[in-house]
Amino acid sequence: MNGIKKSYAEWVAVDWGTSNFRYWVLESDKVLKHDILPLGMQKLNRDEYEEHLIKAIGNLLDPTKLTPILICGMAGSRQGWSEAPYLSIPSKPPDLRHAMPVNSKDRRISVRILPGLRQSDPADIMRGEETQIRGILDKNKNFDGVICLPGTHTKWVRISAGEVVNFQTFMTGEMFFLLSEKSVLKHSVSKGGWVEKIFRESVNEIITDNKLLGAKLFNLRAEFIMENLSKTESRTRLSGYLIGLELAGSRPYWLGQKVLILGEDDISLAYEQ
C-alpha cells in the first residue's frame, strides 16, 4: 500500500447554479471525482461557498501546491460568492482571460469565477450557460443557429460567427417547481412519472391558444378532486402547459431554425418531443 501514489487534483471545474452545485475534480483528462449537490445559490450565504467546496474536494487537494478552481454560474452573481461582472453581447463566450480572482481562506486553492453575459434590449442575463455554449462552439466551430439550454431558467440563444448575438430566458423550470411544490396544485401532482401522449397534447393545446392558461392550471386540481385525473397525468399536463407556453413565446428562435438542445436527458427529451 505504501507504494501507491495518491492522485491529487490538477484543477477543479465547478458549475455553481441557482439550484445545484456541480463539480469535476480533474487530473489531466481523468475525472477523479464528480458530484451534483443540492447546494445552489438559493440556499447559500456568501460565506458558505468555500466551506462547501472544501468539504467536497478537500481530500483531493495537494497540500504542497496551489490547485486552480474555475467556477461558472451563479457563484459569480451579486448574491453569490463573489461578483464577476457581465460581458455585453454580441460577444464570444468568456474564457480564462475574463475570469475574476476570488479571495479564499484555504491556502491550497486559487479560485477564479467566469463572468456571465448580458443583453440590453430586451434586458436579459445568463450565468453558467455561456460556459456550456463555449464548450459547444469549441467542438462545433462553424455552428450557426440556435442553442436551447433547458433548466430552472431555460435559455434560447442565437449564435452567429462564433458569437452570442441575442438570447431569451424563460422561467419555465422554476414555475414548474413553484406550482408543483408550493401552490394548491402540490396535492394533485406526482413527484415523478410521465405520459407522453398527454404531454404532446398539452403542449399543442397551449401553443395553439394560451389565453386560458390560468384557468387550465386550476382545472388540474378540479379534475383530480373529481377523480378524473391521476397525479401522474396532472404532472404531465402541468409540464406540457408550461413548456407549451415557452415554445409559443420562443417561436422566433426555433421555427425554421437549426436548433441544438443541451441539458439533462429527461428535460432535453421533453423539449425535443
Q: Language model features by range: what are they?
A:
Residues L53-P68, L247-L255:
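Phosphate/pyrophosphate-binding loops at sites that engage ATP/ADP/AMP, CoA/4′-phosphopantetheine
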Residues K65-S77, G151, I243, G256-D265:
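Short glycine-rich phosphate-binding loop at a beta-alpha junction
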Residues Q42-L44, L117-D209:
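Glycine-rich phosphate-binding loop plus the immediately following alpha-helix
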Residues D62-M126:
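Short beta-strand-loop/turn "lid" adjacent to the catalytic site in phosphate-handling enzymes
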Residues F21, L26, V184-Q273:
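ATP-binding/phosphotransfer module of carbohydrate and carboxylate kinases, centering on a glycine-rich
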Residues L26-K30, R107, R158-E163:
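Short acidic-glycine loop/turn motifs at beta-strand connectors
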Residues W11-Y49:
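Short glycine-rich, Thr/Ser-proximal phosphate-binding strand/loop in the N-terminal lobe
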Residues V14-N20, M74, C148-H153, T172, ...:
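A short acidic Gly-Thr/Ser loop motif
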